[in-house]
């Protein structure tokens, strides 16, 4: 009934293979590296707690506000200084997947041939498919 209301590109959206894996696996019964699901025991909770306390102590509620889309300026400046590049050329992303998606959006046109290894990172393949790349590998 509503199929004709969606954009033409909606057909390029695929179900997440990682989500499909998670549906079929009892994540408490195994240590699976298939979906990037580390053991909860490996998280440095005390260090995270202390870091959060330090950040809140220094920045208060401002730490939880939206920031610049290119990333927090202090972090961008530190990265620019470390790698001797102009700060205007530094983009901070919130995850590797966001970085892959931004790069794909900027660099890949529909129909561009992209050579990949097999197997490849599923998140990258999804991003490439959503921008209608011709994936070979």
Stretch-by-stretch model annotation:
Residues 1-65:
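N-terminal "arm"/small-domain region of PLP-dependent enzymes with the aminotransferase-like
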Residues 59-137:
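Conserved core of the PLP fold type I
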């Amino acid at each position: 009934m509503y199929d004709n209301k969606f954009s033409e590109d909606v057909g390029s959206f695929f179900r997440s293979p990682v989500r499909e894996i998670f549906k079929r696996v009892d994540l408490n019964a195994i240590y699976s590296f298939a979906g990037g699901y580390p053991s909860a025991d490996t998280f440095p909770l005390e260090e995270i707690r202390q870091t959060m306390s330090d950040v809140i102590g220094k920045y208060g509620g401002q730490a939880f506000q939206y920031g610049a889309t290119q990333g927090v300026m202090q972090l961008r400046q530190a990265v620019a200084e470390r790698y001797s590049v102009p700060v205007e050329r530094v983009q901070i992303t919130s995850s590797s997947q966001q970085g892959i998606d931004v790069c794909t959006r900027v660099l890949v046109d529909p129909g561009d041939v992209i050579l990949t290894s097999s197997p490849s990172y599923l998140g990258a393949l999804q991003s490439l498919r959503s921008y209608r790349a011709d994936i070979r590998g």
